[in-house]
Structures are given as C-alpha cells and as structure tokens.
Amino acid sequence: MFARSFSNASRTIARRSLSTRSGPAPSSLWSSRNAVIAGTTLAITALAVTSERRKVFNESAQKATSPRDSIIAQDSLKENVHKKSVRQDEFSGESTKPEASTSSDSVEKAADDAAQILEEKEAEASEPSQGAYNPETGEINWDCPCLGGMATGPCGEQFKAAFSCFVYSEAEPKGVDCVELFKVMQDCFREHPEIYGEVDTLGLVLMFYAEIDDDEAPPQEGTMEEKVEAAKEETAAPAAAP
C-alpha cells in the first residue's frame, strides 16, 4: 500500500516537470531521470520492507497456538493426570489387600481356636467323673487326681497297700482288718513331714469310702473313729503283753 502511493506520487512529479517545460533541455532531462530513478528505488525498497513484514507476520501467526489446539492440550493434560491418579489408587488398593487378608486370617484363626477350646471343655464336662476304683473292672487307678498324689513319693507303696486292703476288705465295718497297714502308712507319713505334713488317718478312711462308692454313705465320724481306735488297741495289746 505504501509502495503504490509512493510510486503514484513520483509519476505525478515527473509529469509536471515535463509539462511545465517546453523544450527538452539536457539539464532538465537529467533531473527527470534522477527523479524517476530515485522514485523507483524508493518503491522497490518499500516493497521489500512490506514483504519482509508480511513474512514475519505470517511466521508469527503460524507459531501462535489456536484456541482449539490449546483446548486439546488441556484435555490431554487432564487425561494424563486422571490416569496417574487412577494408577496410584489401584496401587494403594493392591498394597492394602495383603494387610486386610492377614488381619482376616488372624481373626478366623482366633475364632477357630476359641471354638475348639470350648468344644474340649464341653466334652470334658459331659464325661462322667471316674473315681480311683472301678467296681466294674475291679481295678484301681493310681494316677487318679482324686488320690492327691499319695500313690507316689516315699510312702507310695505303704499307701497302695492300705488303700488296696480297704478296697477289697469284706470285714464289718469295712477296712477294720486293714488297721495295721494304716498304721504303717501313717508312720511313714510322719517320717516325711516336709511332703505329707499332718495327715489325718480318719480323713483318709473317709476319703477311701468316698472313692469306693459315692452312693454309699460314709459312716458317722464318731462311730468310725471309735472302731479305728478300738482296732488299734486290739492290735497293740498283744505286742505289749509279757
């Protein structure tokens, strides 16, 4: 636009110069040529500048990002961020699965152990308690806790002899023929007070009655004590005679 205006102006000046002078003097012709050359040079320079400006403007326009491209780039960025967040959530979920599984296994194992212990206790409670003597087989269970560990230790043999005699005794009252064995057992207990302490013979006799037959009521304490003492006196009387 600028080059076109400048070219028109230079042509107008040249025409006026030619029309105002009637004769083609050499000096005027030289001046006209110079003016034409100068105008042409200026026009060419203006065209070159204008072309360069358009080139720079086009390159800048091409480099500029359109709104559509900007929106697409933002959408891509959001999609990448979303994918990254989803991956992190999946990773954290996978990392917590083993811990949750371990905790669940521990709870189930504890519940199974508790159920097993409860079943064992119920089975023990449902089983009838057995004494030291089984009247059906006629056997004595020396390991029965009801004997209080008397069958073991330094006086275990004396205890077994007295208890066996009492169990199989058919005398009346029962066990009166085992007084001597009870006396030997009691003397052994007295020799080991650190183990047996003060043992009551009458208490042992009552325990024997209870172990033989739970349905059979033990004799009265006074009556049994009198019979035991009488049996001791009868046993000791021949030894004291001259």
Swiss-Prot record:
Pfam families, sorted: CHCH
Mitochondrial intermembrane domain ranges by topology: 52-242
Ranges for domain CHCH: 152-196
Disulfide bonding pattern of the chain: 144-146, 155-188, 165-178
Biased composition (Polar residues): 1-22, 59-68, 93-105
Cofactor: how bound: Cu(2+) or Zn(2+).
One GO MF term: protein-disulfide reductase activity
Residue positions of motif Cx9C motif 1: 155-165
A GO biological-process term: protein import into mitochondrial intermembrane space
Membrane-traversing stretches: 35-51
Cofactor(s) this protein cannot do without: Cu(2+); Zn(2+)
Taxonomy, superkingdom: Eukaryota
Cell compartments where the protein resides: Mitochondrion inner membrane
GO cellular component: mitochondrial inner membrane; mitochondrial intermembrane space
Transit peptide: 1-18
Segments for region (Disordered): 1-30, 58-111, 215-242
Keyword Membrane among UniProt keywords: yes
Bias (Basic and acidic residues) ranges: 76-90, 224-235
Alphabetically ordered keywords of this record: Disulfide bond, Membrane, Mitochondrion, Mitochondrion inner membrane, Oxidoreductase, Protein transport, Redox-active center, Signal-anchor, Transit peptide, Translocation, Transmembrane, Transmembrane helix, Transport
UniProt membrane topology term: Single-pass type II membrane protein
Free-text comment about domains: The CHCH domain contains a conserved twin Cys-X(9)-Cys motif which is required for import and stability of MIA40 in mitochondria.
Described function: Required for the import and folding of small cysteine-containing proteins (small Tim) in the mitochondrial intermembrane space (IMS). Forms a redox cycle with ERV1 that involves a disulfide relay system. Precursor proteins to be imported into the IMS are translocated in their reduced form into the mitochondria. The oxidized form of MIA40 forms a transient intermolecular disulfide bridge with the reduced precursor protein, resulting in oxidation of the precursor protein that now contains an intramolecular disulfide bond and is able to undergo folding in the IMS.
Quaternary assembly: Monomer.
Protein name: Mitochondrial intermembrane space import and assembly protein 40
Native source organism of the sequence: Cryptococcus neoformans var. neoformans serotype D (strain B-3501A)
Taxonomic classification: Eukaryota, Fungi, Dikarya, Basidiomycota, Agaricomycotina
